[in-house]
Amino acid sequence: MALMFPRLARNFARNGYFPTDEVTLERALQALAPAPSGRMRICDPCAGEGVALAEAAHILGRDKVQALAVEYDRERADHARGLLERVLHSDLFDTMISRQSFGLLWLNPPYGDLVADHSGASQYQGSGRRRLEKAFYQRCLPLLQYGGVMVLIVPHYVLDDELTGWLSNHFTGLRIYAAADPTFKQVVIFGIRVRRQDLARADANQVRSRLQAIGAGQEKAEEIPAAWPW
């Protein structure tokens, strides 16, 4: 499946922004399937050029989804506006978005350490290493409905004890794959949001251990597949 929408010409990594390579993006998108009925709201809170969310809307059916993108960089936000109806050019941490509003959360957050003067630092709640990826995860998780799907794209080494604990307590059906292009050491994580009391604890612990091993470099995630069994 080739991408339908044009990418920004100068779409290169800078200032914590790391675009997903096209092969990984194509394969991750192929894992999505439209809901059998009704409309779905989908969100990319770190939308970059907007291509990932535009492609997701196309796959899920433009007439069946309402898409919201948030992007900090003006040039990328302007490009996204050419692909999507609703694009906020804003710092995500300055936005007010209703909780549990979305059935799909596509999250490829900025990568790097969370410095004290970052807008998300005052809202951060955690005891482990302070990372941008974790701050954006905390900010975005409440936006996703229970039963909704998250696609999270982060470097594997961010999967420390704290983040893997959050993931295994917030999601069921977690699957992790290595990006097709290893340049940024990214992994793609799929999960379905669930209430903690509904988790199978033994399964959650097993998944957490695997995520920790991949994060520590003790185990390698398999490459994201070119075809899915559904």
Regions found by a protein language model. Name each.
Residues 96-104:
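A short acidic, Gly/Pro-enriched loop at the edge of an enzyme's catalytic core
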Residues 49-62:
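Conserved SAM-binding loop of SAM-dependent methyltransferases across substrates and taxa
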Residues 38-48:
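Conserved class I S-adenosyl-L-methionine
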Residues 128-192:
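Conserved Class I SAM-dependent methyltransferase catalytic core
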Residues 80-81:
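Conserved SAM-binding loop
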Residues 1-37, 52-54:
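S-adenosyl-L-methionine
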Residues 66-71:
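Conserved SAM-binding motif I beta-strand of class I
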Residues 184-230:
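Flexible, glycine-/basic-rich loop-and-beta segments that form/coincide
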